[in-house]
Amino acid sequence: MQNSNVELMVYGDDVADDTVSIAKGDVIIKHSQALDSENYLFITLDTSKASAQELVIKLTDNDGSIRDFSYVLKEREQGSASRVGFGPADAIYLIAPDRFANGNKENDNVEGYGDPANRSFKGGRHGGDIQGIVDNLDYIRDMGFTQIWTMPMLENAMDKYSYHGYSTTDYYKIDPRFGSNDEFIALSAKAKSKGVGIIMDMVLNHIGSNHLWMKDTPSHDWINNNGKFVGTTHKREALHDPHAINSDIKGFSDGWFVPTMPDLNQRNPHLANYLIQNAIWWVESAGLSGIRVDTYSYPDKAFLSQWTNRIMDEYPNFNIVGEEWSVNPAITAYWQADSHRHDDYDSALPSVMDFPLQTAVVKALSSDESWNSGFISVYETLATDFLYGDPNNLVIFPDNHDMSRIFTQLGHNKDKWNMAMTLLLTTRGIPQVFYGTEILMSNEGSDDHGIIRSDFPGGWPSDSDKNAFTGHGLTDDERWAQQRIKALLQLRQSHPSQFKGLLKHYAPENGVYTYIRETDKNEVGTAAEANTTQSDKIMVILNKKAVKLSLSKYAEVLSNNQTLTRLSDGKSFKASETLNLPAMSASVFIVQ
C-alpha cells in the first residue's frame, strides 16, 4: 500500500489505559492513544515490512491482566492497485436493493433487528437482498449495463425506514437482511465474471442514531454540535462564496440532516482516518470498480480532499463520483479534479453527478421552443463544460432514487421519455439509469420516496401478473421502452470509442437539436477501439415538430459519400438526402 500505517480502533471495557504489545517483529506499534471515552484505544501499526499474517495483539492493564485479540493482515489481490474504475464507455444501473428482488426469504427478518419486513408499507422493508441481485445479473448484463450502483447495504439497525441504507450503524458489516459480507464479495466477483462492475455507495457525512458511537462516543468532538441535533442550512453556496461568513459555512457543514442522522465531525483526525481506511478496505475486500459518495459536499471540506487523495493515491485509475445536488455547473464543477476554480483547493474527486444537465433535460422537454426555452437549456448547460476538469467523466442521469421518476417528471409522455433517454444515453458523460426506468415505472400522484422506490415487478415469487425480467405481463409501451433502452445500451457497447470520445453539437434551431459523437483520435487506448469502427460517428437528432431536414446542413460533420443507418429500423440514408422526421422524434444514426 502507498500508506502502510494502519490505525486500529479498539473498543472494550476500560481499554484506554492498557499497554499494547505484539509478539511478531515485522509489524511495529508506532503509538497508541486514548481519547475521552475510557472504552476506546487507537493503535497505529507500521506494516511496511509485514507479510500476510494473523496478528495477536495483547492489551495489558495496570494490574497486569492481559487480554488479546486477533487482527488479520491479508495478501492483496494481484493488480489491485492498477484496477480501472468505471468510465465514459460504461452504463450504470442504480438499484434500491430492498426493492429490486427477494432472492432469500430467510433473511427478510433477522433476530435482533427491528423494522420487520412489510411489503404493504411503502416505507418499510420489502425483502429485496443481495441474492436477488445475483439471481438477475444476466438481465442486467443482457440489457447492456456494465456497472451496478446499489443504494447502501451496510448495517442500518434503525427502528424504522432502515431499507434505504443511509443511516449506517456499522461501517464494516453488510446488513444481514441483505446478506453477509461474504455474499457481497461474491456478488462483486460474479458480476465481474459477467463484465459488470460494482460501485459502492458510501456515506461519510453522517451515521444512524443507533450507531454505537451515539451510545459511547469516542471523544467529545466526534459528532458535530456536541452530539445534539442542529439542522443543516443546506446553503452549499457558502463553501464557494467569496463573500461568505464563517457561520454560514459552519451552518452548512456541521448541521444534521435529521435527528436520526448524527453529523460526523471529520476534523477529528481519528474519525477521518477511520473513514479513509474503511473505504480502502471495501475497495480491496470487495474488488470494487467505483465509489459513489452520498451528500458529497456536506462533510468537512479539508477532509474530502484528504479522503479522495488517499484513495486515488492507492488506485490511480479508480473512479469516485460525488453527489453534489446543485443545478449550477459552477458549483458542481468546483469539486471535480482539475476543474477551474477560484482558489487552490485540492480536489482529487474524478467525477460528480451532473444535476445541472438532468434539470436542463426536463426543462427542455417541458417547455415550448423559443429563443430562451426548449432545447436551448440543454445546449447552454453543455456549453459550460469548460468549467469541468473532465466533462466526459460526469455521471449523467434522467432521475434517481431521491426524485420523481423521469416518466412522471415528463407528464407520463412516452415520446418525451424517449427523447430524454436517447439524449442521456448518447451525450457526453457516464449514463446512470434507475431500476424500473426501462419499463416506464412512475410515481403518479405521490412524490413519496417509498413510492418512487417501488418494487421491481417480477422480483418476488408472488409477482405472477407481471415480470419485467422475463417480459411476462408487460404492456406494449413497457416492452417497447425496455427494448429501446436495450438498443441504446448495446449501441454504446459496440461503439465504445465514440462514447468515450468527442461531442459536437449544433445550436438548436426550430425545435431541432442535433449532435454527433466521434472518436477522439488522441484517446484510442485499446486494440478493440483501434479497429475500423473508430471512423464511425453516431449522429443524434431530436425534434419536437414534424420536419423535413436536409442533411446537407450538417456538411461540417458529414460528407456526401457517407451513409447514415437508423438504429430503430436499420434503414439507411445518404448524407445528401432529406429526412422526413415525425414530431417528437429521437433519431439515432450510425454514420459510416
What kind of region is each of these model predictions?
Residues M1-A16, E75:
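Beta-strand/beta-sandwich contexts
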Residues N5, A50-E54:
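Extracellular Ig-like/FN3 beta-sandwich strand-entry sites
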Residues F42-A50:
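Short, hydrophobic beta-strand segments
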Residues Q53-L59, D63-A91, V134, D138-R141, ...:
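Carbohydrate-interacting/catalytic domains
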Residues A91-Y93, I148-T150, I198-M200, I291, ...:
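Hydrophobic faces of well-ordered beta-strands that scaffold small-molecule active sites
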Residues F100-I280, S285, L304-E314, A330-T332, ...:
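Substrate-binding/active-site clefts of carbohydrate-active enzymes
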Residues H206, H211-M214, I280, E284-S289, ...:
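Active-site-proximal helices and loops of the catalytic beta/alpha 8
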